[in-house]
Swiss-Prot record:
One of its GO terms (cellular component) is sperm flagellum. It comes from Mus musculus. Residues 130-138, 199-201, 261-279, 293-312 are extracellular. Its main location: membrane. In contrast to the human ortholog, not activated by progesterone. Activated by intracellular alkalinization. This is Cation channel sperm-associated protein 2. Disruption phenotype: Mice are normal but males are sterile. Male sterility is due to defects in sperm motility unability to fertilize intact eggs. In mice lacking Catsper1, the sperm lacks CatSper2, while in mice lacking CatSper1, the sperm lacks CatSper1, suggesting that stable expression of CatSper1 requires CatSper2 and vice versa. Residues 1-106, 165-173, 221-237, 340-588 are cytoplasmic. Residues 440-502 have a biased composition (Basic and acidic residues).
Length: 588
């Protein structure tokens, strides 16, 4: 086909050709197995009413299964471990599966969070009772020590469970690594005491302070705190070069202050309060940071002016220039970048939340559609059951009336035969015409009585008895060479009225099916109006139901679709040629 369309190849046409080959190879494979193509869906098999019909009529047909993947929001490691073949085939579940189940449970998470808050309270009480020598408080101190050890052991057990669940995944998570180092720093002072180090050692006191870091474990427990910390880290990453430039200016102004304020730092004048601020590089860096925060800048400047050896002009230029660069320019830039980063993160989070909200609304809407369809099917089933009962009742009643009508029709036929035998002249023919009209009126009256008897209040679509009622029976051959056209038209009109009375249109048709009038009305509608009227019904339809095309139609569809791609490509080239021709025409 590519050679027929041209010597060029199209990716879309090749994709359609491959789809055609794959589809027909699958069909041939299915035909080789069962000599049939799947014509039924899983929903039809699960429907009890339709299933009974299929099992009684065609039991060898294939069923098309539509598999719906269950998308979960968060797949835990324990769930992944449970789906592994080695775990599913093992006789006993592994300990890692049990550890993951414990870590994922909400009870264990709430227990760890309560221990973190309890640790904060215990440390607060220990600090208050540290210097107390009251012997009555020894039981309280012992209880606090036991609580401290219990909290520490609980944190260690949590880390061991994480290692047991997945040792490699533990070190890949930054929050788990942070939690591990916080627990290790709080464990070190207890280990040092067990090794025999004096309790009044300076290093031991510093390590005991690390127990306060256990409160930082809350960062890894609450999602909102994680978002704030991640926003800060992201903002600092974007301000890396700005902070480097700010540190360079810090260093320049600190070195300049040490060099130019030597006389002020070495002055022996009494009453100087800040003469040590520029004594060395570290003090100068601290002083520059103080000026950066606009703290005591005017008091420092006035204290420098007290020394005659220091230049007032240079000291004023130094302080004002640093205030302009550091306090006004750099600080405002840092604040602006922080606000911008937080706004970007907030917009991303709001977009994600809106997406989740839309997904939730879509799921709820789909669930409502399913419930509505199930409710409508249940109502339709009950209504059809009532209609079937009414049809059975009316059919029994109509059979009795049909027997009476047949007897009347036989008597009428005998009368007609006798009248035909006695016809001799025009007068007799006129009298025969009048008798035939009377006989027709007598035939119509039983039909009216039959309609009243068989359908007193209820009517049922698609149920008629043309063989028994004989509404079209008029015997034109026997009569009536002189019967006028007006009389025939009047007789046909009476017949139509009798039909309408015998078979009235039911209200149940509009609720359970489509009538001929509705069909004619829909045919006159335009496409857009038809789509808008049937859109609720289309939305209620199950999207998983598939229509199986015939083999020749499917092949023709793919063939035409492939030709369409080549036609579109030729149309595109012709448009390009036309554009070039118009451009050359304008140039000339």
């Amino acid at each position: 086909m590519a050679q027929e369309q041209g010597h060029f190849q199209l990716l879309r046409a090749d994709a359609i050709r491959s789809k055609l080959i794959d589809t027909f190879s699958l069909i041939e494979h299915l035909q080789g197995l069962s000599q049939a193509v799947p014509r039924h869906t899983l929903r039809e098999i699960l429907d009890p009413s339709y299933q009974q019909k299929l099992m009684s009529g065609d039991q060898e047909q294939l069923v098309r299964f539509s598999i719906k993947p269950r998308r979960m929001g968060h797949i835990t490691h324990s769930r992944r471990l449970l789906s592994r073949l080695r775990v599913r085939c093992s006789r006993m579940p592994p300990l890692s599966l049990w550890a993951g189940w414990v870590l994922d449970s909400s009870v264990f998470s709430k227990f760890i969070i309560s221990l973190i808050f309890l640790n904060t309270f215990v440390l607060m009480v220990e600090i208050e009772l540290m210097e107390s020598t009251n012997t009555a408080l020894w039981p309280v101190k012992l209880a606090l020590e036991v609580a401290d050890w219990f909290i520490l052991l609980s944190f260690i057990v949590e880390i061991l469970l994480m290692w047991l669940a997945s040792f490699s995944l533990f070190w890949k998570d930054a929050w788990n690594v942070f939690d591990f180092f916080v627990t290790l720093l709080s464990l070190l002072p207890e280990l040092v005491v067990l090794l025999g180090v004096p309790a009044h050692s300076v290093w031991l006191q510093l390590l005991r302070v690390c127990r306060v870091l256990r409160s930082l474990k809350l960062f890894a427990r609450f999602r909102q705190i994680k978002v704030i910390l991640l926003a800060l880290v992201r903002a600092l990453k974007s301000m890396t070069f700005l902070l480097m430039l700010l540190l360079i200016f810090f260093y320049i102004f600190a070195v300049t202050g040490v060099y130019f304020f030597r006389e002020y730092s070495r002055s022996t004048i009494e009453g100087l309060e800040y003469n040590m601020f520029f004594s060395d590089l570290l003090n100068s860096l601290v002083t520059v940071f103080i000026l950066f925060t606009l703290d005591h800048w005017y008091a420092v400047l006035q204290d420098i002016w007290k020394v005659p050896e220091s230049s007032r002009v240079f000291s004023s230029i130094y302080v004002i220039l640093w205030l302009l660069l550091g306090s006004i320019i750099f600080r405002n830039i840092i604040v602006a970048m922080m606000v911008t980063n937080f706004q970007n993160i907030r917009s991303e989070l709001s977009e994600e939340m809106s997406h989740l909200e839309v997904q939730y609304k879509a799921d709820m809407f789909k669930q409502q559609i399913i419930q509505r369809r199930q409710h409508s099917e249940s109502l339709r089933g009950t209504s059809l059951g009532k209609v079937s009962e009414d049809i059975i009742e009316t059919s029994d009643a109509s059979d009795d009336d049909d027997d009476d009508d047949d007897d009347d029709d036989d008597d009428d036929d005998d009368d007609d035969d006798k009248s035909d035998a006695t016809e001799s002249d025009n007068e007799e023919s006129d009298s025969e015409n009048s008798e035939s009209e009377n006989s027709e009126s007598e035939k119509i009256d039983p039909e009216k009585d039959y309609a009243k008897k068989s359908y007193p209040e209820k009517s049922h679509p698609e149920k008629s008895y043309p063989e028994k009622s004989h509404p079209e029976k008029s015997y034109p051959e026997k009569s009536h060479p002189k019967k006028s056209y007006d009389e025939q038209a009047e007789a046909e009109k009476v017949k139509e009225e009798s039909k309408e009375k015998a078979y009235p249109v039911s209200h149940s048709i509009s609720s359970h099916g489509s009538t001929a009038a509705d069909t004619a009305f829909l045919e006159n509608l335009d496409w857009e109006t038809l789509v808008h009227e049937n859109l609720p019904g289309l939305m209620d339809m199950d999207q998983d139901d598939r229509i199986v095309w015939p083999r020749d139609s499917l092949f023709r569809y793919f063939e035409l679709l492939e030709k369409l791609q080549y036609n579109l490509e030729e149309r595109k080239k012709l448009q390009e040629f036309a554009v070039q021709a118009l451009m050359s025409f304008e140039d000339k």
